[in-house]
C-alpha cells in the first residue's frame, strides 16, 4: 500500500527530471514551456489534495486532464494590455490599410497601366508620396507611444505553463468520479476522494 511518503519520495526523485521535461521544447507540437507553477500535494485519510499556484490566470485559460495515470495541468498566461496600448492597437487597425489591400495594389494590374494616355503620371507620383508620408507619420506616432513607456522592473513571467503529477502508485486508491476542482484567488485546488474499499491486489478464482 502506497503512503504519503511514497508520493513525496516520487515527487522529490523525479523533480529535476520533470523540470527538464516540462520546461523544454516539445518536438511533437513545438510548444515551449515558459512557466513551471509551484505545486503542493497532500494525502489525508479520505482524499488527495493537489494545490497549484496560477496567479494572474483565469479559469478559462486552464486545462486539466488525466491520461495514462498522469495528471496534467496546462495553459497559457497572456499579458494584459493597458488602456493606452489597447487604444494604439484600435487606432492602428482602423487607420492602417490591410496587408491584403496592399498586396492587391502591388501585385495586381493598376488602372494606370491601361490608361497611360488618359491619366497623367504626375498624379501617380503624388499619390505615392502621400501614402509614404502617412505611413511615416503612423510610425512616428507609434514610436512616440513606445518611448513614453519606461519599464524599470520586469519580473513577471508570461507564456505557456504545464505541470505533471504521476499518480501511478496511488491511482488504485482514488475514485476518479469524485474529482472536484476549485479556482480562487489564483490557487487551483483539485480534490480526489479515496475509495471506501480498495486494494492493489486482485484475487483470481480457479474454475
Curated annotation (Swiss-Prot):
Keyword Zinc-finger belongs to the record: no
Region of interest called Disordered, as start-end residue ranges on this chain: 84-149
Annotated coiled-coil segments of the chain: none
Gene3D superfamilies recorded: 2.60.40.790
Chain segments annotated as transmembrane: none
Keywords recorded for this protein, A-Z: Stress response
Ranges of compositional bias, category Low complexity: 84-101, 122-135
InterPro entries cross-referenced by the UniProt entry: A-crystallin/Hsp20_dom, HSP20-like_chaperone, HspG1-11-like
Keyword field contains Repeat: no
Biased segments, Basic and acidic residues type: 136-149
Domain sHSP: 30-207
Domain of life according to the entry: Eukaryota
Recorded family membership: Belongs to the small heat shock protein (HSP20) family.
Annotated PANTHER family: HEAT SHOCK PROTEIN DDB_G0288861-RELATED
The protein's name: Small heat shock protein hspG7
Species: Dictyostelium discoideum (Social amoeba)
Gene that produces this protein: hspG7
